[in-house]
Amino acid sequence: MESALLSILTLVIIAEFVIGNLSNGFXVLINCIDWVSKRQLSSVDKILTFLAISRIGLIWELLVSWFLGLHYLAIFVSGTGLRIMIFSWVVSNHFSLWLATILSIFYLLKIASFSSPAFLYLKWRVNQVILMILLGTLVFLFLNLIQINIHIKDWLDRCERNTIWNFSMSGLPTFSVPVKFTMTMFSLAPFTVALISFLLLIFSLRKHLQKMQLNYKGHREPRTKAHINALKIVISFLLLYASFFLCILISWISELYQNTLIHMFCQTIGVFYPSSHSFLLILGNPKLRQASLLVAAKVWAKR
């Protein structure tokens, strides 16, 4: 029964891998073509491009770690290979989370309307704010890598003291649990910032819609429709982001109690976030949405 469920989850992971690479790759391709043709790219398109690149890397890392964990191959990886694999996972996960958070801050500063002097100051300097936040996150990345490297070194030393590299499968959680715990702790900051940003954005959009409904009774202008669509995308993103964060927590707890099935199930749900959210970003971006419709029309015409 357990092997059948793992086979089903593996098929789901592969499907998410293909969908995630196609959707994120599409966004990178369209923005790069636009960048080459126009010699410039808007701030939001730059964020979307680098976000898509980081998620492609993250999806590949998640797929590799899935098959390594599924076939118990992680314990046979050399010390250098282990560091490369985990460091690349940490870096891709870091930029995936923080670029998504920066995107939420960008939307907040661009769309939301508050009368606070501090908010207006940040709103007028949105590009500088985004750049400073991105540079500031490198401090978190550096600290994260240092802490992860300590866990790797301790685990490798423990393996050497046991004189057998694959001393036991029960020893693997002694390495993976502290790594997952560290990743969870460093994910708290971007998750909290994104949550606050989107709650403020939702509050601002609702307030704006209420004002427009009073001024335009029985009439819905294009701007109102755009705000409603933005609100739907924001809520969807918030739910996906929350589910991804919860999966990290549950996965860490399941490994602590060595529950393989729950751990694999959480990994499957976790991959759904970087794979599916790109579709929401494509639908929410006029340029990407138009390009996707053109591609879909050409594919349909060839059929």
Curated annotation (Swiss-Prot):
GO cellular component, one term: plasma membrane
Record-linked SUPFAM superfamilies: Family A G protein-coupled receptor-like
Glycosylation: residue positions: 166
Transmembrane segments: 8-28, 56-76, 86-106, 129-149, 185-205, 233-253, 262-282
Bilayer topology term: Multi-pass membrane protein
Topological region Cytoplasmic: 29-55, 107-128, 206-232, 283-303
An example Gene Ontology molecular-function term: G protein-coupled receptor activity
Keyword terms of this UniProt record: G-protein coupled receptor, Glycoprotein, Membrane, Receptor, Sensory transduction, Taste, Transducer, Transmembrane, Transmembrane helix
A Pfam short name: TAS2R
Primary location recorded for the protein, binned into one broad class: membrane
Residue ranges, Extracellular side: 1-7, 77-85, 150-184, 254-261
Listed InterPro entries: TAS2R (IPR007960)
Subcellular location: Membrane
Extra remark: Most taste cells may be activated by a limited number of bitter compounds; individual taste cells can discriminate among bitter stimuli.
Biological role: Receptor that may play a role in the perception of bitterness and is gustducin-linked. May play a role in sensing the chemical composition of the gastrointestinal content. The activity of this receptor may stimulate alpha gustducin, mediate PLC-beta-2 activation and lead to the gating of TRPM5.
Family listed: Belongs to the G-protein coupled receptor T2R family.
PANTHER family: TASTE RECEPTOR TYPE 2, TASTE RECEPTOR TYPE 2 MEMBER 13
Protein name according to UniProt: Taste receptor type 2 member 13
Organism: Papio hamadryas
Source species taxonomy: Eukaryota, Metazoa, Chordata, Craniata, Vertebrata
